[in-house]
């Protein structure tokens, strides 16, 4: 079967470039082409010659002048022999195309709906793979860093939401002219399309803006210094803008749907009151976190100190939450969770924001080096002036003799300066170097640091003071073998020790009252007291120890102990001597000795009581060991023997008074006859 076709061409199309100059070679073409002034017709058996015999490409040219579409005619008829194998396929395709064309003729919105759906499908599943393949082919890259690349972020954050938004708008535009049979369905259709338009618009632009804010915040955090205090402010601003974008998007979406946001805000006011009453702590923490992010008293990785409800908190800020508590990593690496509102009502010290660290200390020099203190202070000032890490201009640098400590009379030197660093470890190193230099200055001048003082005093009786030469006194350089006493400072003696000493001091006073009632006991006790004081001094000179018991206790023993037989024997031997003297002279001497011994006994007794109290107090504060401990019977015997050797007049005077009282009746009896 042969198909015959005709080709009609308009003369104005200009098949030849130049009709006046034609080569004879084109005679065959002229024989096949019949050109006339009217529409040209070409009758060619295509089965025999084909299109290769017609060379139109070299001769077709655009018209010089514009030709209306009505005058342009192009008709092509062709015929060819076809096989029987492809006839069923051609018929099937023809039927499908015919039916689809008829369906599209019945529903015109399908022309617009198909491209919109294709755009949505391409945006969801075709855009990202297409961009990845184009990146790999054009830029010669692999898929390893695809999700971290800028192309991926641009496609997913900006291009894809916009394409989805356009696809949703095209779908709504295609479905808008659809006519539904009922009025209710029309209203539902309109509201549904309006909802899709509003939702797609709000979501697309809100997502793009929020992605832009997040990318900007991420870029700033990567390029800025992590220790910069402005990071926290930018983070707060980014979070605030991010929240504001979505709040505005929700409000706009409600307005587009036809809801009044003013009514919702009014209802939200009542809800805010209820939320405030129910979750006051949560809302307070949120507002406090907003204040912390806005005012920035501290940021992440800063060292702060505060006191919350009596608990000292010191550590590094690890997390500042919006609703959750702030986490501080303590010095012992423990996590401390503190509600945000606690920081708004308590004092917070930010140690990281220090511009300088201060060195402030005192050095106490001994009072024995008072003549060197001027040179020491001057050299210490030179040490601080020569140190390059010490601030010399803006802040003070002080080295002064500030005070004399009254407890030990130490000379206190104030050292105060500032180190030019904000790092604590560097400050500690500079402080160590400065203190070592100051101690070298003290040792260079051969001065001594002050220590606690103990006062050592020598004990004397009245007779010892009169008989001791000035060279052996406390002002001389000669060491004296006399009893010593250690006295601690007053602040080391507590009230309990004082009460005990007062109770012990009350016993000798009671015994003194008993002595006052018995005049003979006074007379006998006075020489014994002197002897006991001398006996108490004798062991100290041998052992150079402080005899605490031998100073205070012999007073009681000498009064209460009766005279021994040896004393009576000595007094008996002296009776004849007393008889030889006159009665008047004996009585006057006895009165003088009684008055002198009683006054001496009172003074020595009072001194011994005071010394005993002091020694008891020092014994409780100082670990004084006694090398010689004698039993009470042996001490009594030693006291009596010491009294005999010292030649005391106490027992002799008492014996003389007894002899005088016996001799007076005898003399009276002898004179009466």
From Swiss-Prot:
The keyword Membrane applies. It is found in: Plastid, Chloroplast membrane. Pfam families: MS_channel_2nd, Msl2-3_C, MSL2_3. It is a multi-pass membrane protein. The modification Phosphoserine is found at residue 571. Keywords: Chloroplast, Ion channel, Ion transport, Membrane, Phosphoprotein, Plastid, Transit peptide, Transmembrane, Transmembrane helix, Transport. The chain crosses the membrane at residues 107-127, 152-172, 193-213, 240-260, 264-284. InterPro entries: LSM_dom_sf, MscS_beta-dom_sf, MscS_channel_2nd, Msl2-3_C, YnaI-like. Disruption phenotype: Msl2 and msl3 double mutant shows abnormalities in the size and shape of plastids with enlarged chloroplasts containing multiple FtsZ rings. Residues 1-75 form a transit peptide. The keyword RNA-binding does not apply. Widely expressed. Residues 492-673 are annotated as: Disordered. GO terms for biological process: chloroplast fission; monoatomic ion transmembrane transport. Residues 661-673 have a biased composition (Polar residues). Signal peptide: none annotated. SUPFAM superfamilies: Sm-like ribonucleoproteins (SSF50182). One of its GO terms (cellular component) is plastid envelope. Residues 510-525, 564-576, 617-642 have a biased composition (Basic and acidic residues). Belongs to the MscS (TC 1.A.23) family. Mechanosensitive channel that opens in response to stretch forces in the membrane lipid bilayer. Controls plastid size, shape, and perhaps division during normal plant development by altering ion flux in response to changes in membrane tension. Acts as a component of the chloroplast division machinery. This is Mechanosensitive ion channel protein 2, chloroplastic. The lineage of its organism: Eukaryota, Viridiplantae, Streptophyta, Embryophyta, Tracheophyta. The gene is MSL2.
């Amino acid at each position: 079967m042969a198909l015959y076709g005709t080709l009609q061409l308009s003369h104005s199309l200009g098949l030849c470039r130049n009709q006046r100059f034609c080569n004879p070679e084109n005679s065959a073409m002229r024989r096949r082409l019949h050109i006339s002034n009217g529409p040209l017709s070409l009758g060619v058996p295509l089965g025999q010659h084909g299109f290769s015999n017609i060379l139109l490409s070299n001769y077709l040219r655009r018209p010089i002048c514009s030709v209306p579409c009505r005058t342009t005619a192009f008709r092509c008829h062709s015929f060819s022999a076809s096989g029987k194998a492809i006839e069923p396929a051609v018929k099937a395709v023809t039927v499908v195309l015919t039916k689809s064309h008829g369906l599209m003729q019945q529903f015109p919105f399908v022309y617009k709906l198909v491209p919109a759906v294709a755009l949505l499908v391409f945006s969801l599943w075709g855009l990202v793979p297409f961009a990845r393949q184009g990146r790999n082919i054009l830029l010669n890259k692999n898929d390893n860093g695809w999700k971290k690349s800028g192309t991926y972020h641009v496609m997913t954050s900006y291009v894809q939401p916009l394409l989805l938004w356009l696809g949703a708008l095209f779908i709504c535009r295609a479905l808008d002219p659809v006519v539904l049979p009922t009025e209710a369905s029309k209203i539902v259709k309109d509201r549904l399309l309006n909802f899709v338009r509003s939702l797609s618009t709000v979501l697309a632009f809100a997502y793009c803006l929020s992605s832009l804010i997040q990318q900007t915040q991420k870029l700033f955090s990567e390029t800025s210094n992590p220790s910069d205090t402005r990071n926290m402010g930018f983070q707060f601003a980014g979070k605030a803008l991010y929240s504001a974008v979505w709040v505005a998007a929700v409000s706009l979406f409600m307005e587009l749907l036809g809801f009044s946001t003013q009514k919702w805000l009014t209802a939200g006011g009542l809800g805010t009151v209820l939320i405030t009453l129910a979750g006051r702590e949560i809302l307070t923490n949120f507002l406090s976190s907003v204040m912390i992010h806005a005012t920035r008293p501290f940021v992440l990785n800063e060292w702060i100190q505060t006191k919350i409800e009596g608990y000292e908190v010191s550590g590094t800020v690890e997390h500042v939450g919006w609703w959750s508590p702030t986490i501080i990593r303590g010095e012992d690496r423990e996590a401390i969770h503190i509600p945000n509102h606690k920081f708004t009502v308590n004092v917070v010290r930010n140690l990281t924001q220090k511009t300088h660290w201060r060195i402030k200390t005192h050095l106490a020099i001994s009072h024995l080096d008072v003549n060197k203190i001027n040179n020491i202070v001057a050299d210490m000032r030179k040490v601080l002036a020569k140190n390059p890490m010490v601030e010399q201009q803006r802040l003070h640098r002080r080295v002064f003799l500030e005070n004399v400590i009254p407890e030990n009379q130490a000379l206190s030197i104030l050292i105060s300066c500032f180190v030019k660093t904000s790092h604590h470890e560097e400050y500690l190193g500079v402080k160590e170097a400065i203190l070592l230099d100051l101690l070298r200055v003290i040792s260079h001048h051969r001065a001594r640091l002050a220590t606690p003082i103990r006062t050592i005093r020598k004990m004397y009786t009245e007779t010892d003071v009169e008989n001791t030469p000035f060279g052996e006194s406390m002002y001389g350089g000669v060491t004296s073998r006399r009893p010593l006493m250690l006295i601690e400072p007053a602040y080391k003696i507590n009230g309990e020790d004082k009460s005990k000493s007062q109770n012990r001091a009350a016993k000798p006073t009671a015994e003194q009252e008993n002595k006052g009632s018995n005049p003979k006991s006074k007379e006998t006790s006075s020489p014994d007291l002197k002897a006991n004081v001398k006996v108490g001094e004798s062991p100290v000179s041998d052992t150079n120890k402080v005899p605490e018991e031998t100073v205070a206790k012999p007073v009681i023993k000498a009064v209460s102990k009766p005279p021994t037989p040896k004393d009576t024997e000595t007094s008996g031997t002296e009776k004849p001597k007393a008889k030889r003297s006159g009665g008047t002279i004996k009585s006057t001497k006895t009165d003088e000795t009684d008055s002198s011994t009683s006054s001496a006994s009172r003074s020595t007794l009072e001194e011994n009581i005071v010394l005993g109290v002091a020694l008891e107090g020092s014994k409780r504060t100082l670990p004084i060991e006694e090398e010689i401990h004698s039993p009470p019977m042996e001490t009594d015997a030693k006291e009596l023997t010491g009294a005999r050797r010292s030649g005391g007049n106490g027992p002799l005077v008492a014996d003389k008074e007894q002899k005088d009282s016996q001799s007076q009746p005898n003399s009276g009896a002898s004179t009466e006859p």
